[in-house]
Amino acid sequence: MAFMNFGKRTLLAGDLKLNRGVDVLRDPIIGTTWFVDATNGLDANPGKTWAGAFLTMSKAFTSAASGDRIYFTGKVREQLSTPAQVFDVRVIGIGTRPRHADSTPAGGETATATWAAPASPTAASALVRVRQQGWSFENILWVGHTDNACIELYRDAESGNSERDAGHTSVIDCRFASGYNGISDIGGVPNVLVQHNRFEALTNFCILGVGNIGAGQSDWEIVDNTFDGFTNGVKISGIGCRVQNNTFTDGGTPNTTVVLNMANTSGVGMGENFVIQNFFQTSTANFNTPDVVGNATDVWAVNASIDSTSAGVGGNFEWGQPA
């Protein structure tokens, strides 16, 4: 392989491994890497190595510029808004699969990357409100508050430098363990990726989206997720979305709660969604309002209900738009 000279690198003392052994990390060509240790950091630190990590995510947010990365460990207990006019930032929890801390055995008492509400949370405020495009949240255990979302996607009607729009957000490899909503789009933002996450025990919705400033949830990809033990699943104003290879349990109260609704009534121009290759604990008889709802121009194909297959016998799939 030919050697490629990409110019200078910033060398950082410290690595991304759980043992935090001394190593050298090469910063990518564009952007700065910031570190947050919510247990042992200090906001007076420079924030550019694990040894000099910030204590709070707030400090990392005020330090970050477009294209940066923020790695964190420990338990963040803050309610924040992403900074204005800062785009394309990745917030990444270190560790393996997101988990709760355990009191025993010794060594398991500190989970590697959790984001939870503070001890005295501000009412009706999300853990993080995303206000500009291109932010990504990865490998995080979310423990939400009882009256608002873990992640809130925001959009307003301003223009120029005053415009706020959370389009192109990515939520990847996270676990939403509790709270009111998992992801809430209150403005109608486009091109959101929700991939390989687990949604559990949320008391309102796993994903809730409305049409407001934007027409609805256009060009979203909701793929490879597990929706398990929730009250209501997904309810969005879907426009040209792809919902594929997800598994859904049957909601808090079968026949009266939402499992998957692509036609939230506040949207404009809903339809042309591809809802394919999903698996539902919901029975075929309940592929209708309010459990499973589509639009006339959607493509619903190769979806399996709990009773579409008999034990030991080749099964059938659900085709066509549910009512």
Where are these regions (language model features)?
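Surface-exposed or flexible loop/turn and strand-edge residues in extracellular/cell-surface modules
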Residues: 1, 6-8, 13, 19-21, ...
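Right-handed parallel beta-helix/beta-spiral solenoid domain characteristic of secreted/periplasmic
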Residues: 88-150
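Right-handed parallel beta-helix
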Residues: 88-95, 133-144, 164-180, 189-208, ...
